[in-house]
Swiss-Prot record:
Naturally occurring in which organism (per UniProt): Psilotum nudum (Whisk fern)
UniProt xrefs under Pfam families: Intron_maturas2, MatK_N
UniProt KW Metal-binding keyword: no
GO MF annotation: an example: RNA binding
Protein name as annotated: Maturase K
Gene Ontology biological process terms from the UniProt entry: mRNA processing; RNA splicing; tRNA processing
């Protein structure tokens, strides 16, 4: 217990340290530290709970001891001259294991990634909360800048970010050797990223989120200073309200003093980011937009040594053009509402035109993503998945049900759902044709054979607030607040838009 308490105190000091972290490299060789770090999420922090864990558990003490031995046997020459040797690649995976545990204690909580699979519902972790924020805030903005934060940056940039907190030279040299050897291990687009183990993927996500955290941690304070310095004064007439009361109580003498009062109205800057896609919305003229672009280009150049071109920043006017973000087409639309006013002797009706936030589905892009996945051809006609004919009938139905459930929940907040109904039609016929190919029959025979089971496959969604519910009208949008990651088909839509914008 004394050893555990000492290590727990060590972990506490490491997590509380804000500027200087000197002795981190020796922690890679403490097996008890690995055990407690991997078990810190549970309430039982003891060696007894670790020893009695299942032998198939990945983070048992036996595996941890083997991990320590591999790290101790690692040499610098193997790191420098390993090439593409698979044996050396397996040896270096142990270093990624240790660095992942260590960085999870060092990196601030704000930059740690959200858990992708949660057992409990938590609306604060939903990516749809971004759209709720945009509905509330973006209405007052007339200029939107779309910026893609680069993934491909030099590995030395991460080392410089760590040097602000870590003062252990040995650990920094070890991290530098690994990063330069693997070129860019924190870029998910590289083929090496998919060849890594889960711990290395977790390290890559952790480093990228820390990179975004440092970027935002420098940018937001500058914006706060900008808001405080660039205040605009407006005149406001106070003597025009309640004139009878003022005349009765002799407030007319104060009219020269109350006629002009300056009120400060600060410009609103709204910032939204998901992964490496960010949006900056504000209210300003064209000259202010150009100043913002120059500011962002200079910010990336002098702070991160990344030469951002002005053409890489997408400029949108929400009143004129729509913009795409996270698989949605976002914009504003005008809507007329009736306002009834009642008086003592009469009543009147007036019409008001208001603007509201509108999120729609990119139907053509959604159909093309379904085509790429093999559910329909290039013209949008449903086709069967021949690769799924080896599965059981229930497995085929469950696969289509899961795809439709994810799509319907993700696009639940869209204003017009015509694209969803078309996607549902494609998935239904694709499912029928897949079953028909398996049984060497026709779609009509398949429908008659499965009956109600086939009809209800794509009509029931696991979320209680699904699109076909009578509780919510088709004119109202409902954002499902239990979604913490994007749908795979939506990712294909984003990849296509990025390729078109880059070309």
């Amino acid at each position: 217990m004394r050893t555990i308490n000492k290590i727990l105190d060590k972990i506490g000091k490491v997590q509380k340290g804000k500027s200087l972290l000197w002795q981190l490299y020796p922690l890679l060789f403490r097996e008890d530290l690995y055990a407690i770090a991997y078990n810190r999420s549970s309430s039982e922090l003891s060696l007894k709970s670790m020893k009695h864990r299942d032998s198939s558990d990945r983070y048992s003490l036996v595996i941890i001891k083997r991990l320590i031995n591999r790290i101790r046997n690692q040499t610098t020459s193997k790191l420098l001259f390993q090439g593409s040797d698979r044996k050396n690649l397996k040896i270096n995976r142990s270093l990624f294991e240790g660095l992942t545990v260590l960085f999870e204690m060092i990196i601030p909580v704000e930059s740690r990634p959200l858990v992708q699979y949660q057992s409990e519902w938590n609306s604060l972790q939903s990516i749809h909360s971004i759209f709720l924020f945009m509905e509330d805030r973006f209405f007052y903005s007339n200029s939107i800048l779309g910026l893609k934060i680069p993934y491909y940056f030099h590995p030395e940039m991460i080392i410089r970010l760590f040097r602000r907190r870590i003062k252990d030279v040995f650990l920094l040299h070890l991290v530098r050797l690994l990063f330069h050897n693997y070129q860019n291990p924190f870029v998910p687009e590289t083929s090496l990223f998919y060849s890594l183990k889960d711990s290395q993927k977790r390290l890559s996500i952790l480093l990228r989120n820390h990179y975004f955290y440092e970027f935002e941690n420098q940018l937001v304070p500058l914006w706060k200073r900008f808001v405080q310095l660039q205040s605009l004064s407006h005149r406001f007439l106070m003597d025009q309200t309640n004139p009878l009361y003022k005349m009765k109580h002799g407030l007319g003498s104060l009219q020269p003093f109350l006629s002009e009062i300056n009120l400060l109205e600060t410009p609103c800057i709204h910032y939204v980011r998901y992964e490496n896609h960010s949006i900056i919305a504000f209210k300003g003229t064209k000259s202010i937009v150009n100043k913002w672009i120059k500011y962002l280009v200079g910010f990336w150049q002098y702070n991160y040594h990344y030469w951002l071109q002005p053409c890489q920043i997408d400029i949108r006017r929400p009143s004129r053009r729509c913009f795409s973000f996270m698989g949605y087409i976002l914009g504003f639309r005008s809507r007329m509402i009736k306002v009834h006013t009642k008086r003592i002797d009469e009543s009147s009706t007036t019409h008001c035109i208001i603007k509201e936030f509108c999120a729609s589905i990119p139907t053509s892009s959604l159909i093309e993503s379904l085509t790429r996945e093999g559910f329909c051809d290039s013209s949008g006609r449903p086709v069967g998945r021949s690769t799924w004919t080896i599965l059981k009938d229930d497995d085929i139905l469950n696969k289509y049900h899961q795809i439709w459930g994810d799509l319907s929940c993700y696009y639940s907040g869209s204003f017009s759902r015509d694209g969803l109904w078309r996607a549902k039609y494609i998935l239904q016929l694709s499912c029928a044709k897949t079953l028909a190919q398996k049984h060497k029959s026709t779609t009509r025979v398949v429908r008659n054979h499965f009956g109600l089971k086939f009809i209800t496959t794509l009509n029931s969604v696991k979320n209680p607030f699904f699109i076909g519910s009578q509780e919510y009208s088709h004119r109202k949008n409902f954002w499902c607040l239990d979604i913490i990651r994007m749908n795979s088909l939506v990712n294909l839509i984003n990849m296509k838009k990025e390729s078109l914008s880059s070309s």
